[in-house]
């Protein structure tokens, strides 16, 4: 507990919150261009080939973003929309690509949680 004299000498310092997605620069999403589309393996104890893309954002950052859903149509030079959100078992992947926006097509034959994968409502 500081004394009044100590507070006069120097004010209390604000605790600055560190952002979990700095490349978005306080925007909800950012547009970017895929520079590389590849698969990577998760850390223990999981095992899979996770689809990720290296994306150069309009903010100037180059980030690794996860491609959610089964199957995708992304390749180099695809223009994608990137949102925040990490993938727990992929170290260094702190962003997600938004399916159904720009060049990233929605997931085919998706019936549940469609809005998360950019899938249209199926015909009855």
UniProtKB/Swiss-Prot annotation:
**Which cellular compartments is it found in?**
Plastid, Cyanelle
In this chain, the stretch annotated as Disordered covers: 105-124
Compositionally biased region (Basic residues): 113-124
Record InterPro entries: NA-bd_OB-fold, Ribosomal_uS12, Ribosomal_uS12_bac
Keyword RNA-binding assigned to the entry: answer is: yes
- Lineage: superkingdom: Eukaryota
Q: Where is the chain membrane-spanning? A: none
Q: Which family does it belong to?
A: Belongs to the universal ribosomal protein uS12 family.
Relate the assembly described in the record: Part of the 30S ribosomal subunit.
Q: What is this protein called?
A: Small ribosomal subunit protein uS12c
Lineage of source species: Eukaryota, Glaucocystophyceae, Cyanophoraceae, Cyanophora
């Amino acid at each position: 507990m500081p004394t009044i004299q100590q507070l006069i000498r120097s004010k209390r310092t604000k605790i600055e919150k560190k952002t979990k997605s700095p490349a978005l620069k306080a925007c909800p999403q950012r547009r970017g261009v895929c520079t590389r589309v590849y698969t990577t393996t998760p850390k223990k104890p999981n095992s899979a080939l996770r689809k990720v893309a290296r994306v150069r954002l309009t903010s100037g950052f180059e980030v690794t973003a996860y491609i959610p859903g089964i199957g995708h149509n992304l390749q180099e030079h695809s223009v994608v929309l990137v949102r925040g959100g990490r993938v727990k078992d992929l170290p260094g992947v702190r962003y997600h690509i938004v399916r159904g926006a720009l060049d990233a097509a929605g997931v085919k034959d998706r019936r549940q949680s469609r809005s998360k994968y950019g899938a249209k409502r199926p015909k009855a």
